[in-house]
Regions:
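Short helix-coil-helix linker/hinge
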Residues: 8-14, 72-73
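Short capping segments at the starts of secondary-structure elements
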Residues: 13, 25-29
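Pre-recognition alpha-helix immediately N-terminal to the DNA-recognition helix
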Residues: 16-20
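A short acidic, leucine-rich amphipathic alpha-helix
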Residues: 33-34
Length: 107
């Protein structure tokens, strides 16, 4: 992944939150992200597809669910930026984390 593409991907509020939530939680399914971000499934999927295209995420199908996590092959400096931002942005993510920690009614 190129540096410019990385920062462009992070420039969108939804994609930034997805990356930060995955950094904090390890892996999440689409319904978890839909619940946390309060956006429709097609919008979540569109943002996830963009992040996959930029090689920031990998996915794994388990039964009927697809789980997403940060790409372990991502350069260390990129992972460090996402991780540091996540750990220092609890106010930015507070509502998302609160909804994520409640039961996911969409699953």
């Amino acid at each position: 992944m190129e540096t410019l593409s990385f920062f462009k991907a992070m420039a969108d509020d939804t994609r930034l939150k997805v990356l930060m939530l995955l950094s904090l939680k390890g892996e999440l399914c689409v319904c978890d992200l839909q619940n946390a971000l309060e956006i429709s499934q097609p919008k979540v999927s569109r943002h996830l597809a963009e992040l996959r295209r930029n090689e920031l995420l990998v996915d794994e199908r388990r039964a009927k669910w697809v789980y997403y996590k940060l790409n372990p092959a991502m350069p260390t400096w990129m992972n460090d930026i996402i991780s540091t931002s996540s750990q220092n942005s609890h106010q930015y993510l507070e509502d998302c984390l609160s909804r994520l920690n409640s039961d996911c009614s969409n699953c």
